[in-house]
């Protein structure tokens, strides 16, 4: 176990955590339960879509060659010999100057090679027979959805790691996936430490605070794609805390503890990691908030020791835990996207370490604007409610003025980044 707390750069801390990343195994779920899950394997087309030539419009199926002389001055008439809707197939084959009334989605009948939209025709009856006339020529293939034009048999439709959206469910249903192969969600255990913690429903008491971190991390875990398992809060007693952590490790894929990672008299996580024989990857990161964030590895499991301060806990989860969950789910871009934004108000604080300022980012006139929200203190809760990004201010800088371009991590975006830290490393040298 590391005894000395030597801060390491943020990107190095992320790299150490990612060294122990895993990929989850496959489970099958009903199509209706697959929304927001991640595909565990590639989905390949087992048939063409469309599976047959079909009409994209309501109209008439004709032979294009019969329209060659059609014009305003010389309308060409066709005998309508059949009428078919979607799901029906005409048993008749078209001869010269014959047409079949066809509905959207219906299969093109034998002999036809073009579809005339109904609004371009004039229908009429003559001697008990149905006819239509048109005044323009058509080419072979006009207004026909060709077999396989949407998807070819054998083509890869979706790659593993794809997040299931409503559009993806439509594609899965098209190819008969009543059950869908998805990645099993990792179970993320959550333990809150601290004698000062009250349950959310408890009335306030002198010297006590409500346990907001557990609810926050629980929600973050769901948003990241995991199954959270709240394992309760434990008091600042070493033996009880150790027993609780050891028991929790039997039930989860990853374990998060909040609080107890600093150097106070009742911060027992370092001692717990030592008793577990854990390999401590780091116990101090050169960042604000969350410098005391600690991550260890024991029994093939990552143990995340997040700060007890809400903002620091929140940042620690987004930077270190979320990418591990996303990688488990086969997401090849598991990190938050890094982008440039314009700072909208002064931020005078010095930055001895890299600072992650909770911010609200929005688009305006083709630019991203970033506005710090709430108090920039690790204990702040109010700054988290409106934040959709972190402004990254490199260590060693002092104060940023409104109008300056800064780097931001977009933490609410569904899409991710493969590795944003090289950009941040460059920005710290500017």
UniProtKB/Swiss-Prot annotation:
Its domain of life reads: Bacteria
Q: In which pathway does it act?
A: Cofactor biosynthesis; molybdopterin biosynthesis
List each coiled-coil range: none
| Biological process per Gene Ontology, one example term | Mo-molybdopterin cofactor biosynthetic process
- Spell out the molecular function terms from Gene Ontology: metal ion binding; molybdopterin molybdotransferase activity
Q: Which Pfam families match?
A: MoCF_biosynth, MoeA_C, MoeA_N
> Which cofactors?
Mg(2+)
Enzyme class comes to: transferase
Q: Does the keyword Transmembrane helix apply?
A: no
The cofactor note from the UniProt entry for this protein is: Binds 1 Mg(2+) ion per subunit.
- Reactions it catalyzes: adenylyl-molybdopterin + molybdate = Mo-molybdopterin + AMP + H(+)
Looking up InterPro entries in the UniProt record yields: MoaB/Mog-like_dom_sf (IPR036425), MoaB/Mog_dom (IPR001453), MoeA-like (IPR038987), MoeA_C_domain_IV (IPR005111), MoeA_C_domain_IV_sf (IPR036688), MoeA_linker/N (IPR005110), MoeA_linker/N_sf (IPR036135)
Recorded E.C. number(s)?
A: 2.10.1.1
Keywords of the record, alphabetical order, are: Magnesium, Metal-binding, Molybdenum, Molybdenum cofactor biosynthesis, Transferase
The entry's cellular-component GO terms read: cytoplasm; cytosol
What PANTHER family does the entry give? GEPHYRIN, MOLYBDOPTERIN BIOSYNTHESIS PROTEIN
Q: Which family does it belong to?
A: Belongs to the MoeA family.
Q: What does this protein do?
A: Catalyzes the insertion of molybdate into adenylated molybdopterin with the concomitant release of AMP.
For this entry, the protein name equals Molybdopterin molybdenumtransferase
Q: What is the lineage of its organism?
A: Bacteria, Bacillati, Bacillota, Bacilli, Bacillales
